[in-house]
Amino acid sequence: MSGTYDDIAPLRRHEPENTGPDQEPTAAATRPATDEHVPITVIEPEGYARGGLVLLHESREFTGSLLEFMRALAGEGWLVVAPNLFHRATASSAGVYGNELFEDFDACFDWLTHRGIFPDCVGALGFDTAGTAAFLVATNRPIGAAISVAAPGITAPLTDQAEALVAVASRLQAPWLGLFGAESTTPLDEVDQLRDAAARAAVASLVVIYPGLLHRADHPGDDEDDAAELIDSQTRIFDWFDSHLR
């Protein structure tokens, strides 16, 4: 049964465990406290979910175009979960990274797997600084696939909790797709460096550069040329998840 609703994803308890890059997400050994959770927005597909997508976003409120894109993903059969990464009082406007990011992602991962989604059928997707977050998740968690759109912080970390993407690209554990345009925060020479760095990882990677700014599914264009770019970027997102979340 399809639908859109809000829910909570319990955080795992902070118990000593291996949190290195080789750790695979698993269900928490003990039940989290009731006040330790991540607020999430869920969009369900019609019928059986073929996999789950954690959509990381930098907005405290969803735009109409972002919700429309989430519904399009659900229309392809994906169970879409979007966490509120700013639920902590300490959350920075620059984004959520480091242990807090991984904790929130793990909560969403557990929420999905508890509803029958296989671990290798969970993907991550993010735009802008949330695209940076999706990339960093893919270097720390062996999920099914990851996609970053216009992700900054390529050669210099965005915050003290983040790492420069080129510095950790060789540690990618999930097939990764990067979509970039002419944003000032993602210079083409840096994007080329990221492409080369990601190629050294043991998983598939693909970087696509668009000539304009309107290549993102969360910022639809107003004319036919913009629409053509938008359709191309959406198709690449759908195809990447189709190919790797099986």
What are these regions (language model features)?
Residues M1-R246:
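N-terminal cap/leader regions of alpha/beta-hydrolase-fold enzymes
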